[in-house]
Amino acid sequence: MDPSRPHPLSGKLVVELAGLAPGPFCGMLLADYGASVLRIDGPRSPKGDVLARNKSSICIDLKHPPSRKVLLSILSRADVLIDPFRPGVLERLGLSPTEVLLKANARLVVARLTGFRRDGKYQDMAGHDINYLAVSGVLAMLGRAGENPFPPANILGDFAGGGAMCVVGILLALVSRDATGLGQVVEANMVDGSAYLATMPRLATKTPFWGSPRGENVLDGGCPWYATYRTKDPGGKYMAVGALEPHFYEVLVRGLGLDKTDLPPREDRANWPRLRALFEAKFAERTRSEWAEVFDGTDACVTPVLEQGELEKAGFEQRLPVNLGATPGKPILPGQGDWTGRTLAKGHGGEEILRRWIGWERGVDYHVEENSGILVACSREKL
């Protein structure tokens, strides 16, 4: 990577109001691609946020006017504000995006990220990833046949449908600003984000490909050649099989030591239980490493199911999700949150950000309360 080339978001100033996972993930994505991200912590901000790579922090009490003025001064120069709060919180704090923030800085992009829709029946309710997936229709697609729907950790709603989709909205607003010169309010929620990600399977439920109940379709665990299988290893290890196409399926069958002519036709779903039983018995005959050796370098679409601890011990390199040839993001270096789980201490690096962003100096423009670490404005000239 050429260090002389700028990162794609270099020069963009992002203010992230501290919150739970989706908002910090949104901020981390922007920081990884060069944005200067300042997290605003409060007296009761969440502790132990591991999604803090490449960020700085200051402490502000948004309910205390002299402290809130620090935030307003920062936002007068910022490009983006990430708001992770429930609907109406900013307004109650006197920080309405349309009536206050955009009037003070017309170029500001205010990204508001909620779990439920802001205009839906659940808008004022608490919730988590499982709830957002539930009302989006996505959760009902996940799980084994005859069993309860099963939540996929909090990856799909919080991070893919929430934080990542919010980044898309922010980038679109920044592109729009290049043409109009104006910022705007961006609204993202995990219900719509998750539902949008599920567009293909949702539409496919109207076709024979995905027309059966949950857990009885090709891609949802019902199909024996798109599933996981336990190996001979003590304690349980697994292989993942994704041999969808017929020519890949033939390679799978040969690798398992089976004769295709002895197997029932896979196109008939009535044969799926028998095929699954045959595959289960075969995979149980060898260890995961032995099966990996059999299928490595083939087009059987068979791979080992690796666990996080194994990847860490093997030195697996965490990389950014998208590589830009001319304007790359920041590489994730060892110790920068790849496997360490390090957190960002409240107030760390924030004073340097204030100096660079708005020219503020401690003791001249603000002071820091001794016990709480809260910043309070002490000069009105620059407010």
Curated annotation (Swiss-Prot):
The keyword Transmembrane helix does not apply. One of its GO terms (biological process) is penicillin biosynthetic process. Gene3D superfamilies: Crotonobetainyl-coa:carnitine coa-transferase, domain 1 (3.40.50.10540), formyl-coa transferase, domain 3 (3.30.1540.10). Keywords: Antibiotic biosynthesis, Isomerase. The active site is at D158. It catalyses: isopenicillin N = penicillin N. It holds the Pfam family CoA_transf_3. Pathway: Antibiotic biosynthesis; cephalosporin C biosynthesis. GO terms for molecular function: isopenicillin-N epimerase activity. Its EC number is 5.1.1.17, 5.1.99.-. Together with cefD1, catalyzes the reversible isomerization between isopenicillin N and penicillin N. This two-component IPN epimerase system may function by two sequential steps, an activation of isopenicillin N by the acyl-CoA synthase component cefD1, followed by epimerization by the acyl-CoA racemase component cefD2. Belongs to the CoA-transferase III family. This is Isopenicillin N epimerase component 2. It comes from Hapsidospora chrysogena (Acremonium chrysogenum). The lineage of its organism: Eukaryota, Fungi, Dikarya, Ascomycota, Pezizomycotina.
